[in-house]
Amino acid sequence: MDLEAVCKRSALHAKPQGLILQYGTAGFRTNAQHLDHIMFRMGLLAVLRSKQTRSTIGVMVTASHNPEEDNGVKLVDPLGEMLAPSWEEHATCLASAEEQDVRQVLAAIVEKEAVDLTQTAFVVIARDTRPSSEKLSQSVIDGVTVLGGQFHDYGLLTTPQLHYMVYCRNSGGRYGQATVEGYCQKLSKAFVDLTNQVSCSGDVKRSVKVDCANGIGALKLREMEHYFSRGLSVLLFNDGTQGRLNHLCGADFVKSQQKPPQGIEMKSGERCCSFDGDADRIVYYYCDADGHFHLIDGDKIATLISSFLKELLLEIGESVNLGVVQTAYANGSSTRYLEEVMKVPVYCTKTGVKHLHHKAQEFDIGVYFEANGHGTALFSEAVEVKIKRLAQELDDGKGKAARTLASIIDLFNQAAGDAISDMLVIEAILALKGLTVQQWDAIYVDLPNRQLKVKVADRRVISTTDAERQAVTPPGLQEAINDLVKKYTLARAFVRPSGTEDIVRVYAEANSQESADRLAYEVSLLVFQLAGGIGERPQPTF
């Protein structure tokens, strides 16, 4: 490793003095002006990770649902999953190192991880459509090449497409072809095979309106739609030709504001969905005959998918370990419906998609979605092989169910949550079951809920357990929350510290909106009093 050359090149990507950023679930994210040095250094780190794992590593330049002026970067591990936690720490150390310490930090990573520097390295790079992304991805390439790594620049991709490419490259082609065409063809063939089962006798062609958040999703959906256009018409809105990325549109806006995005015309009963800026999240919604807006979030998406998978498994007659993974933010009604009606086991993990993904890997079939619409389904290799064998061997109704399940398996992007893949899965299931969007929404009724934030002097005062549903410290807080919850019907509440700033997040749900609002307010007052609240005391919102 020519550290002299690295240091010389690093000086051309100088770090702003005193800037400290932490590698989190979403990698690094901040204003694009501050990211040049981080991009270069993540190129360096990707080479070391590639040498250590003897695999292709991915680097994605994106800031997902953040505003257009921001950008970010995250590394993708060999199976398309997020970077290993120990390497997240290396990323933080390397990004935060002052210029004179870069050499030392790199040497320490090499020693600690026993990196064989003679090993070849291969890195694949992609970016979203932000104005800053092309220049920043060149800084990544600069870091890769100065350490002698080889690379392939995919140019513009959605984040889940890059995860898919990494997985394909490291599976020796078993998972699919590591090209955009390979991705489009695999998903489209599975979708067309599924929708061909649906009788079209006089039916109007199915269509869905898609808000693409003025991001990369529009570009990639347009590239792909001709592959499956016979089965589904997609009408694109916020396609990047006019508005700003994520501005008053996109999945995050729709979920947080509980209203439709700008730039989309909604008629009663029409299915609409929104992607986020890098197309790894999706939420659905519609307006009823009275003009009321209805959101269908990740909880209801997981319920639709897992219920359908359970039905297919029952038809095939296979006993398979199927589980759904949620976070504490999942609506209580969804958990009750899955456990009590569908008899599907539900597991709760800490917030953060990497926790859900890892838990889902423990099942034969693991379905996970965060309420924000980020999720997918994972199938063990043994289950995939078995289902595809049954699909070929069986002729009767069992064979048809096995073939349907085999196509569903191919339609999922198992490397990461993928808005395009998830949309096609949802559209296929709705078509096969003959469900309208209103009927899907009516599977269960969400419990009213409220989320609040409380400013505190130090968020570390609060620690949690039981997948963030119980507060351990400060003493007395959890007991006081329990006493408040007992006053309301079908109620629960929890508090958790933010991962990035000194605030505590409060969640409450109950059988009425007024009760949920009151409970959230009372819990936020407790946090303010017992956990060192600062600034203005929480005020009632009801």
Curated annotation (Swiss-Prot):
User: What does the organism's lineage look like at the top?
Assistant: Eukaryota, Metazoa, Chordata, Craniata, Vertebrata
Q: Name the gene.
A: Pgm3
Q: Which UniProt keywords apply?
A: Acetylation, Carbohydrate metabolism, Isomerase, Magnesium, Metal-binding, Phosphoprotein
The reactions it catalyses are: N-acetyl-alpha-D-glucosamine 1-phosphate = N-acetyl-D-glucosamine 6-phosphate
Q: Describe the function of this protein.
A: Catalyzes the conversion of GlcNAc-6-P into GlcNAc-1-P during the synthesis of uridine diphosphate/UDP-GlcNAc, a sugar nucleotide critical to multiple glycosylation pathways including protein N- and O-glycosylation.
Per its record, how is this protein called by name?
A: Phosphoacetylglucosamine mutase
**Pathway info:** Nucleotide-sugar biosynthesis; UDP-N-acetyl-alpha-D-glucosamine biosynthesis; N-acetyl-alpha-D-glucosamine 1-phosphate from alpha-D-glucosamine 6-phosphate (route I): step 2/2
Query: EC?
Result: 5.4.2.3
GO MF assignments = magnesium ion binding; phosphoacetylglucosamine mutase activity
